[in-house]
Amino acid sequence: MLEQMGIAAKQASYKLAQLSSREKNRVLEKIADELEAQSEIILNANAQDVADARANGLSEAMLDRLALTPARLKGIADDVRQVCNLADPVGRVIDGGVLDSGLRLERRRVPLGVIGVIYEARPNVTVDVASLCLKTGNAVILRGGKETCRTNAATVAVIQDALKSCGLPAGAVQAIDNPDRALVSEMLRMDKYIDMLIPRGGAGLHKLCREQSTIPVITGGIGVCHIYVDESAEIAEALKVIVNAKTQRPSTCNTVETLLVNKNIADSFLPALSKQMAESGVTLHADAAALAQLQTGPAKVVAVKAEEYDDEFLSLDLNVKIVSDLDDAIAHIREHGTQHSDAILTRDMRNAQRFVNEVDSSAVYVNASTRFTDGGQFGLGAEVAVSTQKLHARGPMGLEALTTYKWIGIGDYTIRA
């Protein structure tokens, strides 16, 4: 089965690579329209997936990731339309010039070819990834989690119908609908057909892909994100950022999971934090120094376990640790961070500059929420993933991250001397 999917995807990629920007946008508009026109089919499939997931005891955080509503589905369709408005990187000349030999040389952006994406209970990923791949002239093979099997099948069927109505092969966007995990291992060895693999899931999936894949892998998306509250931070303003970073949508990878508080501001900051977190329904996991102060406040507080500093809660839980200074905060982030998104709240611009220079994450913020690490917020459109590695792509992966380049030499029957 996968062999045939790979062949179909590779053949489709050749056709997609020849499309103009206008033709690709026309396809995306058709997909967006059909997602709305066929919304009832997709939402009914999703309702069945959610019901099964709830019966199987999935956490509320995972159920939130899985669930589609009419508003969310409309938002997904609108995101596809936004991709139409983005500049197409394909065909763009990056650099070049004329050599001494007279050969005119240029480096031009081209599609990667076929993208493979493995992801969990995030039905929006199906459309986000498909739209970005199509915009950049790439075919895509999707393998969603078993929890979203019906939703993904319904969504991909709608996309394929839209493709065929535009004269394009259904092989441009395909989904593996068999939940058998053995197929993941088989997919990881499809380097004959797949040019880049993007896993979007937990640490176990990323480890599996790194160890078994014969395809280049882009890893990331695991967000143990930190906010360091410096001693010069403005408490009221800092709390607004923390509430946003923790509670706006706790199930996302750019949500803050650990708060590091400078010891010199702790006495005045922690009582205010407790009040705010109580109002927001957040449970605080505090180290010994913070626990002593937080226990007298209104927020629910428990003693932090050492392993929780490495946890991506994806829920209304927040680690709180008192640190001695900026060096202590940076050391903690280096030990426990996932190089996703980290922030400092401060009025001391020297400390801010040190934090930016010394915290080696894909996105680093000064006096801003970690929630900004998102393709839409960065002006990249819907993102295919957030990469926390350094080669090929880093941070939110938009259109350019789904391209490579080729060298093109144009001569007049020019030969090398």
From Swiss-Prot:
It catalyses: L-glutamate 5-semialdehyde + phosphate + NADP(+) = L-glutamyl 5-phosphate + NADPH + H(+). Transmembrane segments: none annotated. InterPro entries: Ald_DH/histidinol_DH, Ald_DH_C, Ald_DH_N, Aldehyde_DH_dom, G-glutamylP_reductase_CS, Glu-5-SA_DH, GPR_dom. Pathway: Amino-acid biosynthesis; L-proline biosynthesis; L-glutamate 5-semialdehyde from L-glutamate: step 2/2. Keywords: Amino-acid biosynthesis, Cytoplasm, NADP, Oxidoreductase, Proline biosynthesis. One of its GO terms (molecular function) is glutamate-5-semialdehyde dehydrogenase activity. GO terms for cellular component: cytoplasm. The keyword Oxidoreductase applies. CDD domains: ALDH_F18-19_ProA-GPR (cd07079). Its EC number is 1.2.1.41. GO terms for biological process: L-proline biosynthetic process. It is found in: Cytoplasm. PANTHER family: DELTA-1-PYRROLINE-5-CARBOXYLATE SYNTHASE, GLUTAMATE SEMIALDEHYDE DEHYDROGENASE. HAMAP family: ProA. Belongs to the gamma-glutamyl phosphate reductase family. This is Gamma-glutamyl phosphate reductase.
